Amino acid sequence: MRLTLFAFVLAVCALASNATLAPRTDDVLAEQLYMSVVIGEYETAIAKCSEYLKEKKGEVIKEAVKRLIENGKRNTMDFAYQLWTKDGKEIVKSYFPIQFRVIFTEQTVKLINKRDHHALKLIDQQNHNKIAFGDSKDKTSKKVSWKFTPVLENNRVYFKIMSTEDKQYLKLDNTKGSSDDRIIYGDSTADTFKHHWYLEPSMYESDVMFFVYNREYNSVMTLDEDMAANEDREALGHSGEVSGYPQLFAWYIVPY
């Protein structure tokens, strides 16, 4: 009886040892990278990427990025920019959606909202301020072209968003309107948090889009539900909860 019990204990120990030594699956590796990004341990995440590439496991990085975007993690953009500025450009180019590279290289882009498929532009108003609107028809003129300039602070990346035609930056108004939303307009300077925006990636029906938030007010950029006479819609900073609704509040960022 003692011998049988001893053999049983040895068998259990052997199984435990084998489990400890078993190679980590790609799913486990992807989850480890995912969690490092979620909790903001970017140096650890970058080190994991280097390790996975040495092991020829680039698909693990791609899977982790996919999970981050599908779950709408804001840290995704911060992590990608950390890679971009710390000798990880090829990782971003190879394993992140193309939109990240387009934004980081400051290419000219268009912002098109998902809900209405309107392209963002600036238009003149009577008081000579330029107001942001979504254009219902124009998708090709320079009026709908923009450039993102990154600003890195405390491991967070923000962007100044400039109209390439008007050379003005998007800024959120100080004053709330009747619906508690704020007007978005153009400004020749970009020296306050009201001029800074951050991007939260999202995925809807396999499309990569972005919620565009203002740094000062944490309001998300959207278009008015009411149309003007020309079928354009005024751009607003919306203060309500939008998570989980990319089909209503997210934007495509595509090359111009």
Curated annotation (Swiss-Prot):
Residues 1-19 form the signal peptide. The lineage of its organism: Eukaryota, Metazoa, Ecdysozoa, Arthropoda, Hexapoda. This is Low molecular mass lipoprotein PBMHP-6. Keywords: Lipoprotein, Secreted, Signal. This lipoprotein belongs to the group of structurally related '30 kDa proteins' that comprise major protein components of the fifth (and last) instar larvae and of pupae. Transmembrane segments: none annotated. The keyword Ligase does not apply. GO terms for cellular component: extracellular region. Coiled coil: none annotated. Pfam families: Lipoprotein_11. Its main location: secreted. Belongs to the 30 kDa lipoprotein family. It is found in: Secreted. It comes from the Eukaryota. InterPro entries: Lipoprotein_11 (IPR004943), Lipoprotein_11_N (IPR042046). It comes from Bombyx mori (Silk moth).
